[in-house]
Amino acid sequence: MGKERKKASVSLSPQTVFAVKTCVYLALACFSGLSLWSFQHNQPYTQNWIGLLGWSLSSFLLYNFGVAAFLIPLNFGWLSFLNMKRTPAPLAFRKAAAFGAIPVCCAVLLSMISPAQNLPQFLATRVPMVVMDLQPPKAYLGGIPFYLLYDGNSFSLKLLIGAVGTGLIFLAILLCAIFYLIPKSFVLKKKALLDDLLKFLKNKFYACWNACKKLLKNLVNNKSYVPKPSLRVPSSPSVAKKEMLKLPTPVISLPLENKDLHDDSSVNRTIFLTPPHPTKRTLSPQKRTDLPNLLPKDSALAPAQTSYKPLPTPSPFVLAGDAPDLPQYHLLSKRNVHRPESLLEELKKKAAILQQTLASFGIEAAIGNICSGPTLAAFEVLPNTGVKVQKIKALENDIALNLQASSIRIIAPIPGKAAVGIEIPNPDPQPVNFRDLLEDYQKGTQRLQVPLLLGKKANGDNFWTDLATMPHLIIAGTTGSGKSVCINTIVMSLIMTSPPTDIKLVIVDPKKVELTGYSQLPHMLTPVITESKEAHSALIWLVREMELRYEILRFLGLRNIQSFNSRTRNVDIEASYDKEISEKMPFIVGIIDELSDLLLSSSHDIETPIVRLAQMARAVGIHLILATQRPSRDVITGLIKANFPSRIAFKVANKVNSQIIIDEPGAENLMGNGDMLVVSPGSFAPVRVQGAYICDDDINKVIKDLCSRFPCKYVIPSFNTYDDPGSMDPEDLDPLFNQAKTLVLQTGNASTTFLQRKLKIGYARAASIIDQLEEARIVGPSEGAKPRQILVQLSNQDD
């Protein structure tokens, strides 16, 4: 045949090449190590474990390198280890060169020692014994060539730079080679430990110095040094001694005979005390109330019956998390989480692949800390000097391909660290149980005013935040991303950490099935709202409650709800106010699910009070949580977005939605099932959190337990007739009201001068009719020079 057959080219895969190199280097390490260990001058080559070849190799290495020859097998072993980690060839060559410089430097430094005699048996039978200058045979620890290099007759380092210079130069080269081989992550860990130790010693030194200085000052002034009593009583004498060294300056000095000071539970929970009245006054269960009566008695918004009476002295302000009547975490079901032992080894393999991938693209970097969370694993990449961070960011898809990950997230750089964070899905994901978060919170010492126990971060740490500092929150995510579970977690966080006297809830659920089970909670101001008309009435009520609270704060000269709840009550001043002032203002949290459905039905009615509450309600303890599965620009408008700095993004459909909710892409790559990005005020980057999960059975058990502990008393039983135009008294309406309403709806013009001209009435009467139309929610509020907005259509109104 005229055609020649082409020879099939055989190409080896990179894995095979690395495996072959590893075996070769490991064999050389064993070969040289065994031959050196079994070598002796006075024995025949047959006694060497490697035979004649091993005896000859050992004789050559020991003659030229001396004792430093034993480092050569370690060099081959290090090369085998680098190939096992799949270190790229250029980086492996540089590390091997650094390791090869170590025996050379050691040989020169050993040659600086005078030729030794009377060596141990192990060295005497292995290092070269040479007769020089008709002297008795001596052992040269660094080998003959390096000794001649250091102290030869014609040319020597000792003659050129001296013994001190030679030692400094080769010692510096040796240290540089060692430091180059030490991993950067190991150095950073030791540096962090050293910094913490120095900081601890510094604080202790200054504490002792200040104590001694104050003691010496009192001794010089001939005064006995007696520390002032503190508000907190130590639990043991050893703790008392430590507290005396800290020299606290108490704000309030209490008599030592006060029996309340010996009650640890009351001391730990009390953060406000009144010196003239050390005893504590509490309300009986029959007098327990759900919401302070901040409204006038004749108002339609006030509850029918109230049991609040002004007290001569305020009760101590008890933190919400320590209330003894709240259900504990034991009520929830416990789930055992098992982590396989092979997880750490698998993550180390992923880290090696990550380092190899970066090196293949010319990025020299080390792998720092490896954190394993419930569903995510995070790697800290420590790039070398000169590496652009954006270059790592551009390799997101390539890194995901090599790590075989469904999606990854790159944080470039990590705020506050000289590192780049790479988050990948955990090979063994585990759900986050809400019971674990609640248990850690109830057992811990940190207490928040409006706690939200959301989940765990990528490194496994608990993540909870205070809604009082956020102060409003938007939650967005597609169906099945975990948005509804997050809302249930938020509600459970509030009701299991705060009594009904501290936090009240207003919940809007247009779906009518997700949150209606919370209607019987004692924390509820009103049953769960399911109609958009009732939602608007509830928002209007919250606006008026906000205005009333601001009036009370202005009258008392206070700035916020915290100062109101911790004030010292003056009965005479509060009695002069025209409305009854309660002892305490509870926080009010409004939760609105499916905001997009409400905005579709009545956009202006819903958006206007939401924006006003978001702008002003923080100081008086009213906070909003909005949730939507469609984070588009017509739902999360510019006004809403500007007044809601805190946002939670679950998995969204595309990059545009992620840009709307958290101002940057990334939410479209989340894994779903509770995987979220949390943006807080003042944060440099979104925090990735795995949301906690709580089952329906646990929710029902908690609701049943709370209903048995606290009575359910609604402040407003229903918003069906609240602020409803149809419920207005016809006698209060102007006789021309219906005619003016029809005229406004037909023409679309709602101005006082227009009605004055068309109806031929005076200005005062026309202005009164406009006010009645606004109260009936037919026209919007005045917007200055702009015309009033028409809120309803003519077909929707009945004559």
Swiss-Prot record:
What is the topology of this protein in the membrane according to its UniProt annotation?
Answer: Multi-pass membrane protein
Chain sites annotated for binding ATP: G480, S481, G482, K483, S484, V485
Domain FtsK: where? Answer: 460-659
User: Which keywords annotate this record?
Assistant: ATP-binding, Cell cycle, Cell division, Cell inner membrane, Cell membrane, Chromosome partition, DNA-binding, Membrane, Nucleotide-binding, Transmembrane, Transmembrane helix
Induction per UniProt is: In infected human monocytes transcripts are present only on day 1 post-infection. In patients with confirmed synovial Chlamydia infections, 0/8 had visible transcripts. In infected human Hep-2 cells, transcripts are visible from 11-48 hours post-infection.
Q: Which PROSITE patterns match?
A: FTSK
Family, as annotated:
Belongs to the FtsK/SpoIIIE/SftA family.
Subunit description: Homohexamer. Forms a ring that surrounds DNA.
Q: What does this protein do?
A: Essential cell division protein that coordinates cell division and chromosome segregation. The N-terminus is involved in assembly of the cell-division machinery. The C-terminus functions as a DNA motor that moves dsDNA in an ATP-dependent manner towards the dif recombination site, which is located within the replication terminus region. Required for activation of the Xer recombinase, allowing activation of chromosome unlinking by recombination.
Q: What is this protein called?
A: DNA translocase FtsK
Q: Which organism is it from?
A: Chlamydia trachomatis serovar D (strain ATCC VR-885 / DSM 19411 / UW-3/Cx)
Encoded by which gene?
ftsK
